[in-house]
Structures are given as structure tokens and as C-alpha cells.
């Protein structure tokens, strides 16, 4: 019978030499004093470099602005959470009782952070070239389909440009609620937009993410 650890490693396309590193990468702050946040910090930087390097060589005639937007699309929390679900990481996360009860194994922010932590763990367990190969294998289809252009602009930028094009006032964002403990907060942001009857509400694990979520909803309403 295949063990859970082996199933996960097959999904990741990487066999760990250190089972302790793999376990640490899956351990949320709520579960243990020794958790994956340092690995997450490391993995975030490695991921950004690997994706930037690939885009630089993949698009030799694209300017810095478009490359930055493509990289942001590929390394954002939403994309990382999608990867986490593809790996079925929710089945392997080590969470405290509170996070388990609140469905933390489904939360985008926790899945995204875990993917970054796994990247950090693979780097420490192997080397730069090996972690590069793993990341590029995860991102192969996304890298083959991504293209420079307006679709890579974040929702706040697109909303601002949409309103400017219609000669309307810029949106106003207000934080209306912050819920949860310091390491696991949820922000609620209200976005007031000229042309919409009611403010739109966005939620996210940071103020910026909540604002982006609200802007995305506002765009959908303006375009409908």
C-alpha cells in the first residue's frame, strides 16, 4: 500500500531525502511552534526568481512592465492555491484544531503558503537546479499559455483604467472589518464606484488582496 507521503511526493514530482523537511513544509503555525513560515519566505523568493528567469528567456522582446505583470499572475496567491488543489495538499496539511474546524485545509491563503514552503523545502533538500526543474514542471502549461497584455494587469489597475476611460471618478476603498488572529486575518473592504448602485465588498487575507477582490467584482458589474 502506498503511504500518504509517497502519494504526495508523486504528485509533486519530487522525492524528499529529508522527511523532516517535507513534514515541516506542511506544518501550519496553528499546529506547532515549529512551522513552515521560514520555508515559505525562502520559497517565495525562489519561485519569483525561477519564473522571472523563464519569462526573460521565453519573451525576449517583451518589456519589463509586461514581464512583471505576467510574473505577478503566475506567483499570486490564487495561482498557488490552484496548484495546491492540484496536488490535493489539503489532505496532507498539518493544522491546529481551530484551523481544522474552520476548514483551513480549503483556504486559499494556507494552500498558497504551503506551496511556497514546499518550494523552500525542496531547495534545501536538493539544489537550485533541481528546484528550478520541479517548479517549471508544475508551471509548464501555465507558462505555455500566458501572454503579455492587458489580461495580466491586476483588477485594481484595470478598474482604474476603465473608470478613467469613462471619465468617471476613481474608486474609493475602505476597510470595514478585520477578523481573526494576527497570523490569520481576513480583511473586508468596501469599494465605492461611480456607476454602481451599491458598494461592492471584497475579502482577502490582506488589505491589498481584499481590495483586488472588490475591484474584480466591480469590473464584472460594470461590464455586465
From Swiss-Prot:
CDD domains: DSRM_RNAse_III_family (cd10845), RIBOc (cd00593). Its EC number is 3.1.26.3. Gene3D superfamilies: 3.30.160.20, Ribonuclease III domain (1.10.1520.10). The active site is at 44, 116. GO terms for cellular component: cytoplasm. Pfam families: dsrm, Ribonucleas_3_3. One of its GO terms (biological process) is regulation of gene expression. Residues 5-127 form the RNase III domain. It is found in: Cytoplasm. Keywords: Cytoplasm, Endonuclease, Hydrolase, Magnesium, Metal-binding, mRNA processing, Nuclease, RNA-binding, rRNA processing, rRNA-binding, tRNA processing. Mg(2+) binds at residues 40, 113, 116. Belongs to the ribonuclease III family. Digests double-stranded RNA. Involved in the processing of primary rRNA transcript to yield the immediate precursors to the large and small rRNAs (23S and 16S). Processes some mRNAs, and tRNAs when they are encoded in the rRNA operon. Processes pre-crRNA and tracrRNA of type II CRISPR loci if present in the organism. This is Ribonuclease 3. It comes from Photobacterium profundum (strain SS9).
